[in-house]
């Protein structure tokens, strides 16, 4: 049996917390946790600890929350921990080379896609947005680049036709910890194999924006439907009708032909709101009007039928 690793864990959101929990149940020793400083949250804007900090405190693990690693004090504090390795999962801070070089075995990162396909901040969303058949988790040895380090372990998952970013996030949050613990076992045993990324196959998964999530009805129906799933739970695909912003939670593609201008409502009944697009027809199945929760289209039509009259054009 390999000697347990002394691990410093760096992460912030719930996705990271699930990986920390797996490490705490493994043979390895988590000697310290780094996480983002407490941030105001909720209506009262009360300073709130990250999910990672909450778990660390429950297990009496020392917590460090530097704003950055620019100071000599911050770098020295990490060095004093004498860690074998740092595990980084959705930490939210860029790590300078001096930090990457501090642990004996360097730093590894859990990335929510199959590298090098999607590097950057929004790989889960972009994989759905692009119509990829699968995604997964990559464990990589970190270098100074953006998700450019050598790959140590990859596990894949199919993207189902009904998957949203929310459902894929949950699936990867379950897969990632398993792959991480397996990878650490390889590292501890000295059997991990590092594979260089093919930079020519890399794409940048840029952050999502509310502007991008506004539906362009000139696009083809299949692309819009993928956007609806990719932008759920944020920033949510939306359109305007009667000067109201409507969020789309669920839709489907109808393979019917039409000659109506893009954005025109072709039909509206309990089966959905049928909207002409640049190619094909998009059927809205679940939407959210201002001040209400997401509802089946039938319920919305009972209250707001005038907004969705056949022949009217959505913007």
From Swiss-Prot:
Enzyme Commission (EC) number: 2.1.2.9
DNA damage as UniProt keyword: no
Entry annotated with the keyword Lipid biosynthesis: no
Domain of life: Bacteria
Pfam families membership: Formyl_trans_C, Formyl_trans_N
CDD domains: FMT_core_Met-tRNA-FMT_N (cd08646), Met_tRNA_FMT_C (cd08704)
GO CC term, one of those recorded: cytosol
Keywords: Protein biosynthesis, Transferase
Residues reported in the UniProt entry to bind (6S)-5,6,7,8-tetrahydrofolate: 113-116
Catalytic reaction annotation: L-methionyl-tRNA(fMet) + (6R)-10-formyltetrahydrofolate = N-formyl-L-methionyl-tRNA(fMet) + (6S)-5,6,7,8-tetrahydrofolate + H(+)
A GO MF term: methionyl-tRNA formyltransferase activity
Family indicated by similarity: Belongs to the Fmt family.
Function: Attaches a formyl group to the free amino group of methionyl-tRNA(fMet). The formyl group appears to play a dual role in the initiator identity of N-formylmethionyl-tRNA by promoting its recognition by IF2 and preventing the misappropriation of this tRNA by the elongation apparatus.
Protein name in UniProt: Methionyl-tRNA formyltransferase
């Amino acid at each position: 049996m390999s000697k347990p690793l002394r691990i410093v864990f760096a992460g912030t959101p719930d996705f990271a917390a699930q990986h920390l929990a797996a490490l705490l149940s493994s043979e390895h020793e988590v000697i310290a946790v780094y996480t983002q400083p407490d941030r105001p949250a909720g209506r009262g804007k009360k300073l709130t600890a990250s999910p990672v900090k909450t778990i660390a405190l429950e297990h009496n693990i020392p917590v460090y929350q530097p704003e950055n690693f620019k100071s000599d004090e911050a770098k020295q504090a990490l060095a004093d921990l004498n860690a074998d390795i740092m595990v980084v999962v959705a930490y939210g801070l860029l790590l300078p080379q001096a930090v990457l070089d501090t642990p004996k075995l360097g730093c590894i990162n859990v990335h929510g896609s199959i590298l090098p396909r999607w590097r950057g901040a929004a790989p889960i969303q972009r994989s759905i947005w692009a119509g990829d058949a699968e995604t997964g988790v990559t464990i990589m040895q970190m270098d100074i680049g953006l998700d450019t380090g050598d790959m140590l372990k990859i596990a894949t998952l199919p993207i189902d036709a009904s998957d949203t970013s929310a459902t894929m996030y949950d699936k990867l949050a379950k897969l990632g910890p398993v792959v991480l613990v397996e990878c650490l076992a390889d590292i501890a045993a000295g059997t991990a194999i590092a594979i260089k990324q093919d930079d020519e196959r890399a794409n940048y998964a840029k952050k999502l924006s509310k502007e991008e999530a506004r539906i362009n009805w000139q696009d083809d129906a299949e692309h819009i439907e993928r956007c609806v799933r990719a932008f759920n739970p944020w920033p949510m695909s939306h359109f305007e009708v009667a000067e109201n912003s409507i969020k789309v939670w669920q839709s489907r593609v109808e393979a019917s032909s039409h000659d109506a201008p893009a954005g025109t409502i072709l039909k509206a009944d309990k089966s959905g709101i049928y909207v002409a697009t640049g190619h094909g027809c998009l059927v809205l199945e679940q939407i959210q009007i201002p001040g209400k929760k997401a509802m089946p289209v039938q319920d919305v039509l009972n209250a707001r039928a005038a907004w969705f009259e056949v022949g009217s054009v959505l913007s």
